[in-house]
A protein has these predicted regions:
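Active-site neighborhoods and metal-handling regions in enzymes and metal-associated proteins
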Residues: 1-538
């Protein structure tokens, strides 16, 4: 693999023993523009999560359980071996490097695409073995000769009729939260947080209506760092009216060096190392989780109304698709990719449709057990009138984002398939019917979705539910429903999915969108519930 060979020459020239490629960009998001997909470029693995490490004579890729099957297939014939992250017997990256490299070695990482927390954690472990970290190098700028450019698509307004709150008021709320935490400002680097605060949308990231930018907010100023060519006159006028200045994207380092406020809040779990390094040493760093994330997660009345309207239209498209599907399969000729195109066309005919919210997962038979499977011309399976079809899909409408999964029986099922389907459905219903007190976290509710399967010795390794943006990213925090995750209270106005699964057979999972609201009949007891937002039969 010439890319790995070229990288090893680079390592020798720079006196580095290894280089680490994470699955992040300078904004530390889940989905990243092609310009920063360095891990995929060096390894060939295209999953959304994973870390590649290359040394002078070895190469390995760590990824989680969602991608074990896909990674094994995609890494065949490459220098990389698969490390099944989180599984017993799999070393961490730090353990592997400490056992592989001699004391005095230096490991390279690009400071722009590695978070403060991830580097600190690795640094502590490597330091014990006398191994250092160099954050100053980016081999891709030299070796990636056909590297895609940084996206420069236009930025558009997200009108008040869909956002429900002016940007100036969101900034006022943000400043109040910062003041309460003893911070004079903050750097917002997550693209969905910038887009939400500014009431702007873009198309720089596949399936996510965001744009490449940073936002620096102090008590007196708000500065949006973005390529000026992306902004039309209407956007400039809107920002000026909201009290927001604009500067070129590349000017952020200089602005940070000139930062004269006493303190700045940084979410070290989602802020890259270089942002911290450019701030003056006299600046006090307030390390705290993002205060924008929980603000964004609690939807206002306009956003909730938009969610319901978007899901109603999406439900119409889904019901039309399901009515078409079984007769079409019985007639023959349909494949995973052809039904994907059909569903896209039905969604695209709905008002306010803008895009899909993630690449559709249409997995027939064994493909349904591959988490985040995506059909390609070489894997495109023909659909037969038997067994299960997993269909996980969603759309971006200007008034809301959708995400729905259905596991569809295309014909006769085995007894095992019926049992598995029933267990997953029982978990889905048990969670959907939950009543819970104010302050409960997703980690406490997760067992409801798993209980029926646990009684049969079955478990699934992925999360059960995630938040969903409002015409933004389909995955949103800080709240989630899963076993192992930092707790975040579920609050009225949040949206969350309900998607238990069984990937031991072709029966996979169901999913529907739920919102969280106070139960009006039990409000005095502060009870909450999950009223369904999505209308589509199971």
């Amino acid at each position: 693999m010439t890319r790995v060979e070229d990288l090893r020459r680079f390592l020798r020239e720079k006196d580095l023993a290894a280089f680490i490629f994470p699955s992040t960009d300078p904004h530390c998001g889940e989905y990243i523009p092609a310009h920063w997909q360095a891990r995929q470029w060096i390894s060939g693995f295209n999953g959304s999560a994973g870390t590649a490490v290359v040394t002078a004579d070895d190469a390995a890729l760590w990824t989680d359980s969602r991608y074990f099957i896909a990674a094994e297939q995609q890494l065949q014939g490459t220098p990389f071996r698969l490390m099944k992250d989180g599984m017993q017997g799999t070393p961490t990256i730090a353990q592997w490097l400490c056992s592989t490299l001699p004391s005095g070695s230096r490991v390279g990482m690009d400071g722009w695409v590695n978070t403060i927390d991830s580097v600190r954690s690795l640094e502590r472990e490597l330091d014990a073995s006398g191994i250092g970290i160099d954050l100053s190098l980016d081999p891709c700028s030299q070796l990636w000769t056909e590297r895609p450019t940084v996206p420069d698509n236009p930025v558009v307004l997200h009108p008040i009729e869909f956002s429900g709150e002016e940007s100036s008021h969101k900034l006022q709320r943000l400043r109040h939260a910062l003041s309460a935490l003893g911070a004079d400002g903050t750097v917002v680097s997550q693209l969905d947080e910038v887009a939400w605060l500014m009431n702007l949308r873009g198309s720089d990231v596949h399936c996510n209506p965001v744009f490449v930018s940073y936002l620096l907010v102090t008590m007196q100023r708000a500065i949006l760092f973005v390529n000026p060519a992306k902004l039309g006159d209407d956007v400039r006028e809107y920002l000026a009216g909201q009290g927001v200045e604009t500067m070129p994207y590349a000017d952020l380092p200089h602005a940070l060096q000139e930062y004269r406020e006493g303190s700045v809040l940084l979410d070290t779990s989602s802020t890259n190392c270089n942002i911290l390094s450019y701030l003056p040493k006299t600046c006090r760093i307030v390390e705290h989780p993002s205060v924008v994330s929980p603000m964004k997660a609690v939807k206002n009345e306009t956003e909730i109304r938009g969610f319901r309207q978007a899901m109603l239209r999406d439900g119409v498209a889904m019901v039309k698709f399901l009515r078409w599907l079984v007769p079409a399969v019985q007639a023959g000729g349909e494949t995973e990719m052809s039904i994907d195109r059909k569903l896209y066309s039905l969604r695209a005919s709905q008002p306010l449709f803008r895009d899909i919210s993630f690449d559709t997962i249409a997995g027939y038979a064994a493909h349904g057990a591959i988490v985040h499977y995506e059909a390609t011309p070489s894997t495109d399976a023909s659909l037969m009138p038997r067994g299960f079809l997993l269909l996980d899909s969603g759309a971006q409408y200007q008034d809301g984002t959708t995400d729905i999964t259905r596991t569809i029986a295309l014909g006769p099922l085995t007894d095992r398939e019926r049992t598995d389907y029933t267990l997953v459905l029982r978990g889905h219903i048990r969670l959907a019917m939950a009543r819970f007190p104010e302050g409960a976290c997703g980690t406490q509710l997760d067992v409801l979705a798993r209980y029926a399967m646990w009684q049969h010795g079955i478990n699934y390794l992925h999360g059960t539910g995630h938040g969903v943006g409002s015409y933004l990213n389909v995955h949103e925090g800080p709240h989630q429903i899963r076993m192992n995750y930092k707790p975040a209270p579920l609050r009225a106005g949040m949206t969350v999915t309900d998607e238990p699964g069984n990937h031991y057979t072709e029966c996979s999972y169901f999913k529907r969108k739920l919102s969280i609201k106070n139960n009006p009949y039990q409000k005095k007891d502060e009870k909450h519930s999950f009223p369904p937002c999505y209308i589509c039969h199971i």
